[in-house]
Amino acid sequence: MKELLQKKLSDSAAARWTALLAVSFTMMCGYFFTDVMSPLEPMLTSNDVNGLGWTSDEYGFFSGAYGYFNVFLLLLFFGGIILDKFGIRFTGLASTLLMFGGALIKWWAVSNTFDGSVTLPFGIGTYHTQVLWASLGFAIYGAGCEIAGITVTKIIAKWFTGHELALAMGFQVALARIGTACALALALPFAKACGGVHAAVGLGAALLCISVVAFLVYCVMDKKEDASAEAVQTEPEEGFKFSDLKMLISNRGFWYMATLCLMFYAGVFPFLKFATKLMVFKYGVDENMAGLIPAMLPFGTIFLTPLFGYVYDKFGKGATLMIIGSALLTIVHIIFVLPITSYIIAIAAMIALGVAFGLVPSAMWPSVPKIIPMKLLGSAYAMIFYIQNIGLALVPIWIGKVNQANTLANGSIDYTETMTIFAAFGAIAVIISLLLFFENKKKGYGLEEPNIQ
């Protein structure tokens, strides 16, 4: 009995998987809201009774708003420092409330009509007032969602290090992809059935309210975990110091990981935001069904990410998995560049992209704790997510302007230039993943070694 009392709560499989389920549900709701507007682009740019009359440029500006505060106000970077300094419970609760608040602003914006437009400085562009209000809400939500993301990632590392770390992270990603897939597949028909864009956004906001409650449940478990860890700890852990950030900044492996994250995700998430229209204009898919093809990507990762995570836990080869996934991403986008208009090819390419999207995250996120110590993990994930958000903020703006420039007289879009850009992101990701592979050989991070001890 004494031996049992001296175990941490996280040593119980039931306890750690229950904790994982609570925080994964929170992020699943978040990912639903993140992409709930992606399949609605045809309605957003329509001038009919349920449309909002946005331009492609305005939609690109709005899509990029997710990362504006994270990138330009450094909120994500400071969020990582707050996480390491003040802990998981404080940071997680604050970030989930920020998500809900931003979602309410966005819902209010698309539920009302606004007169006039505003010209932004530095030649950014002129946008309708409604677009700016919706973008503000999305930016606030994005700051909360990214901070919640690094918090949840550190939570998983805290509870699963020495156990099924990659499988657990894969499970969390799988639930997140369920959220994304549901948004891509259901948002457009739900909005049409319920009278407009505001209905789908309102549904997402309601789910975020429930997600706050789910995180409160986790907070109770986290407090018990800390108490059990103190009971078995033989000597106090060294706390976070600002001077420790030098160790992070000078780590070449960390920078390879961060750059890989930037390039890989720049080739996936911004692509998803424009993929519905791609299916309509290039592959001739019916507008009501077009969102289902991009939805195949997250649905595929629901099964593949935990599977590849299990492979990493059991057999290792994390760096190799990242190389294969990056190469597959590049091949898929090259296929989308080619003058092939068969929707069957589009479906096959999207399935292959789903495999790539399962390979890289399943190996990348569990590899960070092998490179960075636990006391700096929040800051490390924050910096990686911050760099990722540069892509999430700027790439949609770039792609929106490229699509606007390639809009033909009949209103259709030539996607050749757009998909060439995405293919270039994939090619750079391949190069970076190879550099990480050789850096691991040199420094002995253990990226090719199994996670289960």
Task: Tell me the role of every PLM-derived stretch.
Residues V131, G137-L175:
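Cytoplasmic helix-loop-helix junction between adjacent transmembrane helices
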Residues L73-I88, L304-K317, N403:
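Helix-to-loop junctions at the C-terminal end of transmembrane segments
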Residues A166-A185, A191-K192, F385-P396:
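Glycine-rich segments within core transmembrane alpha-helices of 12-TM secondary carriers
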Residues M37-E41, N251-T305, V395-P396:
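Extracytoplasmic gate region of multi-pass secondary transporters
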Residues G318-M364:
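C-terminal transmembrane helical hairpin of 12-TM major facilitator-type secondary transporters
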Residues L97-T126, A327-T341:
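C-terminal ends and interior cores of transmembrane alpha-helices
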Residues A199-V217, E417-L435:
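Symmetry-related core transmembrane helices of the 12-TM Major Facilitator Superfamily/SLC fold
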Residues K2-A13, E225-M257, Q453:
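Juxtamembrane intracellular "pre-TM" segments in multi-pass secondary transporters
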